[in-house]
């Protein structure tokens, strides 16, 4: 355990930020999972709706520093392609 006051404060801040980031990351994963589940069932309307809901959540994670911009872009691009392919086949 740290003896210096500033180090103790940093530990407290880190714990709070870690918990906050973990919650944000979990939320992003939940939104992505909803899109993937809708794709798996083959329901293109539900998949599109879930994808539209997931987009701002991923962007928010980038803004907050939870995800890197390229990671979010890659995830959105791949999900978009899968939703588009599902819509085209329906």
Swiss-Prot record:
Keyword Transmembrane listed: no
Q: Which residues form the signal peptide?
A: none
- What's a single GO BP term from this record? translation
Kindly give the InterPro entries that the UniProt entry links to this protein: Ribosomal_bS20, Ribosomal_bS20_sf
Q: Give any Gene Ontology cellular component.
A: cytosol
- Entry keyword annotation includes Transit peptide: no
A GO molecular function annotation here is:
structural constituent of ribosome
Q: Which Gene3D superfamilies match?
A: Ribosomal protein S20
Could you list this entry's UniProt keywords, alphabetically sorted. Answer: Ribonucleoprotein, Ribosomal protein, RNA-binding, rRNA-binding
Q: Which domain of life is it from?
A: Bacteria
Pfam annotation, one family: Ribosomal_S20p
Ranges in a coiled coil: none
| Family assignment from sequence similarity | Belongs to the bacterial ribosomal protein bS20 family.
Protein's job: Binds directly to 16S ribosomal RNA.
According to UniProt, the name of this protein is Small ribosomal subunit protein bS20
Which species does the entry assign this protein to?
Acidiphilium cryptum (strain JF-5)
Q: Which gene encodes it?
A: rpsT
């Amino acid at each position: 355990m740290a003896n210096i006051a500033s180090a103790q404060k940093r530990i407290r801040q880190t714990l709070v930020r870690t918990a906050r980031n973990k919650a944000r990351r979990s939320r992003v994963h939940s939104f992505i999972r909803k899109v993937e589940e809708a794709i798996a069932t083959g329901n293109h309307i539900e998949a599109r709706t879930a994808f539209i809901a997931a987009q701002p959540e991923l962007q928010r994670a980038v803004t907050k520093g939870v995800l890197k911009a390229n990671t979010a872009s890659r995830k959105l691009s791949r999900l978009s392609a899968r939703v588009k392919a599902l819509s085209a086949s329906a």
